[in-house]
Amino acid sequence: MPDNPKLPARAWLIVGLLWVGGCLNYLDRVIITTMRTSLQASIPMTEAQFGLLTTAFLLVYGGLSPFAGYLADRFSRSRVIITSLFVWSLITWLTAQAKTYEQMLVTRMLMGVSEACFIPAALALVADYHRGATRSLATGFVLGGVMIGSALGGLGGWIAERSHWSHAFSLFGLIGIVFACVLLVLLRDPPRENGDRATLAQAGSTVRLGEAIKSLFSSRNFILAFIYWGVLGIAAWMVIGWMPTYLQEHFHLPQGRAGLVATVYVNVASLIGLLVGGLWADRWSRTNPRACIYVTAIGLGIAVPAILLVCTTPLLPLAIVGLVLYGLTIAFASTEMMPILCLILDPRYIATGFGVLNLFACLVGGATTFAGGALRDAHIEVSRLFQAGAASMVVCAVMLLFIKPGVAGTSIPTGKLDC
């Protein structure tokens, strides 16, 4: 039976603090997408230039993710988180001072640099604090904050309509700066205890980026996880990118309603799924160290028929049922990814490993969205894209079953690699 060590003090306080941090992380990055009209009225730019603001952010954010993860493995995770939050909040505030398109573009690129450091460090810190049968649920809570922040991004457009676009950046930037000061007082790395993961992850030889990357890709388990995450990204981005279009065309919905149906039901269900999947895996992990793997595979097994229901039924209510089931169960994959990495990686390289996966997810997301558009130009039905996504999820579920707990080339016992 896996070990279930006593939680360090502040373990759930840390989760709460990182929930707020995750919310601000996504809120600050997405508010710009909700105020296009106001922004273009103030700073002249073409539609392509407006799109480039987000593309530039993603390129920098994704490209630096492995290095950002390395920083969280090499230095104090809590200090990396606090620095990241303070810097991106300062840049958010500075964005409000931009007067030209070039200044706006530079702030978005700098935002990518600073925000890249947060998620790998935050999820790794959660894993350090929650070493037993609370890790998946704690991870789910933090990712829930990310989803809430993404949903609250619409506040940017609301503020821009009623005052000025810059006021949203000023407000949320100042909130982030104040919260960074709060974290400076409250956020700490966990106390070190002999044999626990926090010690294993932070002690020993100095972590070097080249050695970390070499160690990751010399692991059969990590290569499987890497491919799995990329293939799953293809399926997820197909749904994210093209579900509104499919609902609009197939059910003859107005554009606004199609967008709401495609996002609200899935996101609400996913928020619940993060917690349900985390709680389920944690309870199961008390008797089975591979629980986080099995819960993810089961979730994918349910998500496949759910998305097939959406793309085959002629009835909108049934399609909504399929969307809810899909959102609920696909979220298991997100909440269990860090626990799975904790099963298979050298503890010194946990955040670096997540950063590498983050980079791959950004690349896959961009390529999949573009490829979907190209297939649409070739008059391929959107339902075919979803069927391909369902097939991809089947492949992912099978790949997961080949991932085995344990770290190749180390003396770390499997019993220490708890979910």
Predicted regions and their residues:
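Conserved MFS/SLC helix-loop-helix module at the cytosolic interface between two early adjacent transmembrane helices
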Residues: 63-99
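Helix-breaking motifs and short loop linkers at transmembrane-helix boundaries and internal kinks
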Residues: 44, 76, 97-103, 131, ...
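Residue-level signature of mid-helix packing/kink "hotspots" within the transmembrane helices
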Residues: 30, 58-66, 150-151, 267-275, ...
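Juxtamembrane intracellular "pre-TM" segments in multi-pass secondary transporters
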Residues: 2-7, 191-226, 250
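Structural signature of the two symmetry-related core transmembrane helices
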Residues: 79-93, 291-307
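Extracytoplasmic gate region of multi-pass secondary transporters
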Residues: 32-33, 220-275, 330, 334, ...
